[in-house]
Amino acid sequence: MTAPIQFIDLQAQRRRLGSKLEKSIMDAVQGGQWVMGPQVAELEKQLSEFAGVKHTIACANGTDALLIVLRAWDIGPGDAVFVPTFTFAASAEVVALVGATPVFVDVLEDTYNMDPASLEAAITMIKREGKLKARAVMPVDLFGQTADYRVLEPICKREGLKMLCDAAQGFGALLDGRRAGGIGDAASTSFFPAKPLGCYGDGGATFTNDDALAETLRSIRVHGQGSDKYENVRIGVNSRLDTIQAAILIEKLSVFPEEIELREAVAQRYNNAFRASNRIVEPRVIEGGQSTWAQYTIQVPDRNKLQAELKAKGIPSAVYYPIPLSAQKGYKHFPSAPTPVSDRICNTVISLPMHPYLDTATQDRIIETVLAAV
């Protein structure tokens, strides 16, 4: 019987880390500081070094990592924050949670990241209507690579907008030598288990080079705490990282650079196999970029047929994302630029198994099934 294929094989990674991981977990348990223990500060230090930033603020999850930045910037009612429509709901959700208005922007068809021309059209629309104040842009580093900040950053500077980079899927990626997490006025990531760098529960982090912002973020994540535990200088949230998760992440970070290389090798084998087919659009990494390949996403003319064939052969797949946020029940009342690309690719994208421990025989099985099905 053919062995089942894992979409993301976290157990293979756990076996690789083995006793080192188990010891780190037990050390955290026996240390007795189970929330914000010393491992959290050590993780923040190592993440700052990895991302090339001055400050890392660990928190409870990737959604909070975005939320606390918007709170620190006093973004709220009457403010507009520009987000891509082709992404996970958290990107727009946090904007609505602070009382601001998400304004949806289309993406580029070949990279799935924010389209600068659509962003400019959305900014012009908001200015012309005069009902909202444009405050920030939140590009998402979708599927593992950064948005094209070489174009987006000048737009933000020209318009006086803050940039909060959502690197939940792209943490570890590079753009012209700059690491995702170290780009923008602030950036965030998620340590949800399925992410390229994930823990064994929920976790997140925010990154910045702004000293004052970092101080405010540290306060907000612990109930708006001041210099004393029971001094509350602002309205905050409860978003502390568990010590055990920090211990796990320290061990995972030690192999993360190598895992990025292994993911790249898998992606290149996929690309080389699919490039010859005129019925498959393989993902493109922008010039000067390196992806962490959080997902390997292709486009095909008949997704349902391919999914059925994959399932019949015991190969998992996923659709990220089947509906643009601007068409979702909870978000369709918010303003949006025209989003023809997102509307179209939601019907054609499909993601294949991708992880560092995907062996060549399994890759070949996936490749052969895809090529035969399309």
Give a label for each model feature.
Residues 98, 158-159, 313:
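Helix C-cap/helix->beta junction micro-motif
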Residues 67-121, 125:
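Conserved PLP-anchoring active-site segment centered on the Schiff-base-forming lysine
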